[in-house]
């Protein structure tokens, strides 16, 4: 499955993405997806699409794509909207029935329905991130980070003691 997420629709639909800056809100969404995996299996891909009000003159033609781990992040180019990009992905998919569009925007739902893509509400998508299995994964991810920090600290201590000999 390929989840296409209407980024601003999601962050404006839930208080857990409140931050002092828009960038902070976007980062909270990306981190939530990365850690809690509401999209399920690692085999499921995720693309988060955000609108960009004005074209950055330093970017190449077209919209801006980047990645955070396995999450693809797309910013529109100021000419084409995020809605247009979401519709383009759904319309051009080889297997549109494997696409799930996460949004509460009825306009996007109507526009992409003919492609055969499925739709999921923001609330359902986010709730899947809080299932016990996903909470376990998030805890494991956090504990792996802590283990790595501890190992690095022990390595520093060990190297320091060896250099003192």
Residue ranges: model-predicted function:
Residues 2-5, 9-165:
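Nuclease catalytic cores that cleave nucleic-acid phosphodiester bonds
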């Amino acid at each position: 499955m390929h989840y296409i997420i209407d980024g601003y629709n999601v962050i404006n639909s839930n208080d857990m993405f409140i931050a002092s800056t828009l960038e902070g809100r976007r980062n909270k969404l990306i981190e939530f997806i990365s850690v809690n995996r509401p999209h399920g299996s690692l085999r499921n891909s995720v693309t988060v699409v955000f609108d960009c009000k004005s074209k950055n003159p330093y970017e190449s033609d077209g919209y801006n794509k980047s990645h955070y781990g396995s999450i693809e992040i797309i910013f529109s180019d100021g000419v084409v909207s995020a809605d247009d990009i979401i519709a383009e992905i759904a319309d051009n998919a080889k297997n549109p029935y494997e696409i799930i569009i996460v949004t509460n925007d009825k306009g996007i739902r109507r526009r992409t329905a003919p492609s055969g893509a499925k739709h999921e509400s923001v609330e359902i998508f986010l709730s899947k991130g809080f299932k016990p299995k996903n909470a376990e994964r998030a805890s494991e991810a956090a504990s792996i980070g802590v283990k790595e920090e501890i190992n690095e600290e022990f390595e520093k201590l060990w190297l320091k003691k060896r250099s003192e000999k």
